[in-house]
């Protein structure tokens, strides 16, 4: 007969802790969070890139109108 009893106390394997909810993965590195312990806010300056896009659109519309009138 074996020396080890099958009815030993469950002290070797304690019950797992009760979870507080589903696991939520942490955000990726560099993702802004609500943690304000290291809040260093850098001011962002915007630069105007000019009105090249507007001029290009107007030129394209004029070109379409001229081609439509010619053909």
Curated annotation (Swiss-Prot):
Residues 1-36 are annotated as: Disordered. GO terms for cellular component: cytoplasm; plasma membrane. Involved in resistance to abiotic stress. Homodimer and heterodimers. Interacts with CYSTM7 and WIH1/CYSTM13. The gene is CYSTM6. It is found in: Cell membrane; Cytoplasm. This is Protein CYSTEINE-RICH TRANSMEMBRANE MODULE 6. Belongs to the CYSTM1 family. It is a single-pass membrane protein. Its main location: membrane. It comes from the Eukaryota. One of its GO terms (biological process) is cellular response to hypoxia. It comes from Arabidopsis thaliana. Mostly expressed in roots, stems, rosette leaves and siliques and, to a lower extent, in flowers and cauline leaves. Pfam families: CYSTM.
């Amino acid at each position: 007969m074996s020396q080890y009893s099958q009815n030993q106390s469950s002290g070797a394997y304690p019950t797992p802790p009760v979870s507080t909810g589903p696991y939520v993965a942490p955000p990726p590195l560099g993702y802004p969070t609500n943690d304000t312990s290291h809040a260093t806010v850098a001011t962002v300056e915007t630069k105007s890139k000019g009105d090249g896009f507007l001029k290009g659109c107007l030129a394209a519309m004029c070109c379409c109108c001229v081609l439509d009138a010619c053909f």
